[in-house]
């Protein structure tokens, strides 16, 4: 079906775990005719949750792509995970999407992962609309949820719909644009609905919220301001145009509501996607850089007449077709059996097949164009974040940032036959998942696997067994500690070796200084006048990059510091990049105990929903874990939300303790917050353990 690019909508469905993302997506696929039955998550039958682990656990683990059509518009959808351990899937999806639907649990409102994905969408300037889901559940409160969107996310919610009833009395919605009530017929699984007059007891509230809608929308357009001033109202088409404009500019976020599981509100959500979210030609201009000159900016126009440019945002292994590379096309066209340039690696890649995906189902296509999201078969060198383009139009698009792992496990093959298979399996899994890291412990020879959480690594081990038939012994999870420095020091260091054969000489003067948390490692050269030839300076940086991974105190990577190369000296014959690399390492070792080294540990933001009667016990347990309560919120319905900061080291196995404290009635979620200094008594314990 040929669709104009102005009628494309590339969207993601994002939310906290269990807010109902996948259920909402399944209803969208049913009502758009993409599938002829409703797949339920709790039955393990959701088409978008196709992995065995997803079916068994009832959660989304990997982002799944699909395409459907609504009101002559093509909607490319990516359903993303809600569990914090798989936040990389959200990150790379939002990087290539034009808009998003943020789904909220009508009872819990804004939850920790809701905040995380919201900030990720902010980072990429992704316009979004909100869907307050589960309005049929006990304790659902639409107005509290809207308030939380404002206070916890710092957003400007613009209410477009109001619920008619709540909990078991939830019947439908009031559309504030048309000022009509929409009532769904339950016997048709929500496929049929009717427009009716607004119930008289809700008319005043509807008018109140419509006035707020008109006030905000009219400011988006000069014509609308004049019309609103003259008539105190706006025609429906002009009102929609204004809401769309404000949404795309990020002035506000439209808020809709419903119950996906009860089949209410999904069609009007689809209308909202079409009416308010941008097409590829409505978003900010895409700017790339010249691979040979990073200062030279190149503008990309979203037109199929332009040269081909795309971003690879995901690589995965398919047991039937091999490696699949998912791309978003930003300009031009692409044909199967053609060749493209990987601009970052300056390598030509041949495309075997081109596929349109529906979760794990594949449809071969011969051509794709600007705005399309497709999977390519046959690429050998391309990884997540690489730019693909026409060979005569080299360009680099902005890469994605991936979070550092916070937890690690030691892993070793059970048998010698598993040894080689383990390496192959891990290399493929690491290639798929940029938040998964692998290294080898130099002393023990053990393979160390690092990830975003216990569940993340548990799934990886399970996939190794199922997909690669590898059996492995796995150690207990360990915290991925870090180290940093707290003082600035300058080090003069000379590396000299002249005992027979070719000599080595390099002299460096390096200033080491602490950085604010989150800044990682920075290197700067202030060499002027040729004190060190420029071809030797990368050797200094490389030496520091390598040695910082071993840390100072207990062998953990050193982070959040800057090294500035101030001065140095060289020898015409005996100097080399290697000599300067060794000099940098020597300077680092000399700096180690002079710069006030400290150990850092990952601190988690923990959110617990508990019945009020267990609140004291829950808070007491948090305090015993070196945690601190930072906020409490009354959910109503005898429930409280406790927000706390707790070291990850003290959160292993927490779910079992929480169940015991609350007789199984409390639940929690957590995500990485920051690194903080470890108390000295804990450092002493860690030294005994790791040194």
Curated annotation (Swiss-Prot):
CDD domains: EF-G, EFG_III, EFG_mtEFG1_IV, EFG_mtEFG_C, EFG_mtEFG_II. Catalyzes the GTP-dependent ribosomal translocation step during translation elongation. During this step, the ribosome changes from the pre-translocational (PRE) to the post-translocational (POST) state as the newly formed A-site-bound peptidyl-tRNA and P-site-bound deacylated tRNA move to the P and E sites, respectively. Catalyzes the coordinated movement of the two tRNA molecules, the mRNA and conformational changes in the ribosome. It is found in: Cytoplasm. Residues 6-281 form the tr-type G domain. GO terms for cellular component: cytoplasm. It holds the Pfam family EFG_C. One of its GO terms (biological process) is ribosome disassembly. GTP binds at residues 15-22, 79-83, 133-136. GO terms for molecular function: GTP binding; GTPase activity; guanosine tetraphosphate binding; translation elongation factor activity. Keywords: Cytoplasm, Elongation factor, GTP-binding, Nucleotide-binding, Protein biosynthesis. InterPro entries: EFG_II (IPR041095), EFG_III (IPR009022), EFG_III/V (IPR035647), EFG_IV (IPR047872), EFG_V (IPR035649), EFG_V-like (IPR000640), EFTu-like_2 (IPR004161), G_TR_CS (IPR031157). Belongs to the TRAFAC class translation factor GTPase superfamily. Classic translation factor GTPase family. EF-G/EF-2 subfamily. SUPFAM superfamilies: EF-G C-terminal domain-like, P-loop containing nucleoside triphosphate hydrolases, Ribosomal protein S5 domain 2-like, Translation proteins. Its main location: cytoplasm. It comes from the Bacteria. This is Elongation factor G.
């Amino acid at each position: 079906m040929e669709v104009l690019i102005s009628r494309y909508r590339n969207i993601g469905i994002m939310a906290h775990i269990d807010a109902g993302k996948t259920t909402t997506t399944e209803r969208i696929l049913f009502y758009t005719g993409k599938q002829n039955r409703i797949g339920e998550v709790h039955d393990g039958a959701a088409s978008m949750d196709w992995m065995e682990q997803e079916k068994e656990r009832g959660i989304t683990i990997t982002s799944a792509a699909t395409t459907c059509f609504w009101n002559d518009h093509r909607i490319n959808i990516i359903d993303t995970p809600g569990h914090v351990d798989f936040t990389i899937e959200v990150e790379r999806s939002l990087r290539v999407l034009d808009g998003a639907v943020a789904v909220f649990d009508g009872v819990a409102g804004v939850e920790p992962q809701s905040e995380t994905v919201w900030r990720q969408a902010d980072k990429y300037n992704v316009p979004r609309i909100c869907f307050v889901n589960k309005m049929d559940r006990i304790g659902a409160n639409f107005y509290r949820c809207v308030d939380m969107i404002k206070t916890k996310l710092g957003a400007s919610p613009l209410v477009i719909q109001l619920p008619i009833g709540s909990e078991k009395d939830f019947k439908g919605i009031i559309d504030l644009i048309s000022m009509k009530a929409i009532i769904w017929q339950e016997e048709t699984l929500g496929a049929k609905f009717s427009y009716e007059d607004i119930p008289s007891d809700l008319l005043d509230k509807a008018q109140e919220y419509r006035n707020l809608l008109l006030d905000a929308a009219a400011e988006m357009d000069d014509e609308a301001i004049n019309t609103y001033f003259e008539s105190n109202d706006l025609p429906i088409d002009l009102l929609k145009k204004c809401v769309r404009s404000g949404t795309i500019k990020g002035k506000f976020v439209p808020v809709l509501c419903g119950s996906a599981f009860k089949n209410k509100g999904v069609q009007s959500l689809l209308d909202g996607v079409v009416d308010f979210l941008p097409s590829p030609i409505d978003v900010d201009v895409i700017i790339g850089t010249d691979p040979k000159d990073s200062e030279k900016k190149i503008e990309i126009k979203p037109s199929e007449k332009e040269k081909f440019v795309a971003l690879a945002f995901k690589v995965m292994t398919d047991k039937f077709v091999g490696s699949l590379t998912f791309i978003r096309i930003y300009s031009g066209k692409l044909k199967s059996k053609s060749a493209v340039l990987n601009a970052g690696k300056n390598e030509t890649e041949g495309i075997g097949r081109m596929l349109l995906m529906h979760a794990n189902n594949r449809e071969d296509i011969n051509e794709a164009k600007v705005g399309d999201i497709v999977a390519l078969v046959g690429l050998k060198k391309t990884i997540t974040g690489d730019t693909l383009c026409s060979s005569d139009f080299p360009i680099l698009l902005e890469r994605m940032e991936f979070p550092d792992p916070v937890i690690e496990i030691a892993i070793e093959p059970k048998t010698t036959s598993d040894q080689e298979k383990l390496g192959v399996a891990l290399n493929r899994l690491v290639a798929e998942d940029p938040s998964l890291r692998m290294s080898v412990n130099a002393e023990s020879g053990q393979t160390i696997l690092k990830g975003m959480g216990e569940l993340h690594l548990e799934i990886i081990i399970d996939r190794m067994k199922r997909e690669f038939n590898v059996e492995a012994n796995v150690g207990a999870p360990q915290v991925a500690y870090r180290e940093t420095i707290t003082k600035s020091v300058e080090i003069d260091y000379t590396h000299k070796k002249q005992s027979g054969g070719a000599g080595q000489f390099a002299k460096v003067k390096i200033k080491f200084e602490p950085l604010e948390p989150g800044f990682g490692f920075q290197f700067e050269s202030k060499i002027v006048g040729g004190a060190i030839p420029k071809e030797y300076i990368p050797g200094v940086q490389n030496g520091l990059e390598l040695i910082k991974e071993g840390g100072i105190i207990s062998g953990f990577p050193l982070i959040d510091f800057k090294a500035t190369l101030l001065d140095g000296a060289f020898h015409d014959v005996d100097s080399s990049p290697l000599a300067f690399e060794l000099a940098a390492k020597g300077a680092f070792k000399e700096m180690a105990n002079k710069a006030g080294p400290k150990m850092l540990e990952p601190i988690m933001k923990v959110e617990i929903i508990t019945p009020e009667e267990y609140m004291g016990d829950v808070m007491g347990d948090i305090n015993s874990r070196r945690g601190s309560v930072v906020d409490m919120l009354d959910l109503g319905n005898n429930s409280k939300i406790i927000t706390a900061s707790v070291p990850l080291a003290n959160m292993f196995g927490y779910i079992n303790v929480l169940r015991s404290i609350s007789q199984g009635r409390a639940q929690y979620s957590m995500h990485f917050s920051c690194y903080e200094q470890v108390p000295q008594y804990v450092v002493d314990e860690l030294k005994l353990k790791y040194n």
